[in-house]
């Protein structure tokens, strides 16, 4: 339960957090008097800051120092005292539209580019997960003869990801087949598969009733059932380690990362323990309004992963319609520009949702 604050207390908390974010220095009443028009005396500010400290929203890192926000102070600041920057949100959308070439680039390169843009605009470590293939649908299936007795099954999803599987021809022929006959048969089967499966999700393929295929293609029926379903199952397995990460070097130069050991644990999480991070930022939102992305802000100790318990993690899910595909995230020490970071993440998630629609 959040502390109930008066308007004056909210205003002074807002000014304290804002000044600390900008300077990384403990904040005293003198600094607030000089920078903000609070309409009260220095003594009143000191008294209010004392109340905020007793409420657990501020604390003194040293006895003689000013005050800095606690996780609880940041939480009220984020939930009650700020509004995400609409100007920066439009700048993000414009940058993504102008700099990304959806027709010419691979999906991985596109998301790497998007992550770099977000890192530049937010000043945070940017994180973008690859789309989950278990939510993808079939764009095209093709069976091709590679050599005598060997064929390849190629699956292209609507995310433009390509997956393939090499297989032997199904048994059951009384004589060695003519390669041209096999090519014609494979094209007929490919056309049949596309007419039945195009637009279906990979999960639907694995539970599809193949009896109709069995009746029309007795020779290929069981073979197709195991081959296509097997490839779809393999493709649909969540790839929990696929995260595009950018902006690490700049963030690690922040004063909060002055200890080498802390830097090492952050880098280890980003490079070697991405599955833990993926499970934290990828969540299926419960949204009534699917036109805009919900943003989750985890501050400091709200993060369950030890390496980022002094950081804030801002994330939002991008999707196709109501189906979650992946997530956009930003992270840096809890002393960050939340108005900008939240706006950047929300705008990027909305852009990707529209792009994948």
UniProtKB/Swiss-Prot annotation:
What is this protein's name?
A: Heat-inducible transcription repressor HrcA
Matches recorded under Gene3D superfamilies: 3.30.450.40, Heat-inducible transcription repressor hrca homolog, domain 3, Winged helix-like DNA-binding domain superfamily/Winged helix DNA-binding domain
MF terms per GO, please?
Answer: DNA binding
What organism is listed for this UniProt entry?
Anabaena sp. (strain L31)
Entry function: Negative regulator of class I heat shock genes (grpE-dnaK-dnaJ and groELS operons). Prevents heat-shock induction of these operons.
Q: Which InterPro entries match?
A: GAF-like_dom_sf, HrcA, HrcA_C, WH-like_DNA-bd_sf, WH_DNA-bd_sf, WHTH_transcript_rep_HrcA_IDD
**Keyword tRNA processing annotated:** no
Q: Which HAMAP family match?
A: HrcA
Q: Which UniProt keywords apply?
A: Repressor, Stress response, Transcription, Transcription regulation
Single GO biological process annotation from the record:
negative regulation of DNA-templated transcription
NCBIfam families reported for this sequence: hrcA
Give the top-rank taxon of the lineage listed in the UniProt record for this protein: Bacteria
The record's comment on protein family reads: Belongs to the HrcA family.
